[in-house]
């Protein structure tokens, strides 16, 4: 066995320290900075590592907790802005992540399958799930699977790559798949998307938008993470290209890169954009309506940490503007007390944010008082 000694050991320790997520710090909810008139409060806590959310037809908030194999319902029936209790809707699932309510069912994307639970308005506990997709590719990295439904009633599932950078053996990796709601008719919808953790449809144009996490180990500032408008049949570059058609140093194919689809928005490298939502509520000022909000989970392999915040991308006529900070303060120096994951508009018009480090769901509201 080879032992690390002297300067080599010091170098290895320094590298590992630089590549770790920001260190844990005690929660400081009051440290969050928001635009004037906005306020953030804890909606629910003690959830372990909550990830993706969905709002039921009754207005109840549901969240996945993959580490516990659970889907949790968080009703706020009295409308006071706090979950009255946390109710386990489903348990014993295999790393459930994405959630979607559609035509009398709650669909759940597990790491290797899609299941659905019968749902009636007001339900807070689920029955026996039905498996609708049995064979999503698994193994390797990027285990999350996210699900949404399009205006035409099709089901879309994002599947990340199995690696940092490689040529996949299974074409369903680093892709978005399309199915009928019953799981039939599965096919590739778009490719070359390294890890689209978040997917959603634009409420006005009907276009599919996605976050995409770029590859690692090319420095602090490259490649950028991306927001994509996902077109049917398009290829978005990975693993051959990064950013805006820049050939990869390991697997680059310059001629092919010229044919790939361009991103709609680029974000600071290693920010780790996860959930995204177009604001459709009536609580925020008019200038926020229709804008895109994105949760940046935060870097783990950058010498100076970045992310750990919520950004707003103004939308004008369906065209994205320059990203701007909306909620910051989870990162304090080199310490982070939380990591934002998903963002969603609640029935009350507030913006809800999940945090898988602090184990909380936050509620961001606006008031002129």
Q: What does each model-found stretch correspond to?
A:
Residues 42-47, 87-92, 132-139, 188-192, ...:
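Surface loop/turn motifs at the tips and blade-to-blade linkers of beta-strand repeat domains
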Residues 79-85, 122-124:
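Acidic, glycine-anchored loop motifs typical of Ca2+
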Residues 7-18:
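Bacterial N-terminal signal peptides
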Residues 53, 60-63, 105-108, 155-157, ...:
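Hydrophobic beta-strand segments that make up the repeating blades of beta-propeller
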Residues 41-67, 272-278, 294-295:
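Beta-strand-rich domains and repeat architectures in extracellular enzymes and scaffolds
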Residues 100, 112-150, 158-162, 185, ...:
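Asp-box/WD-like beta-propeller blade repeats and closely related beta-sheet repeat scaffolds
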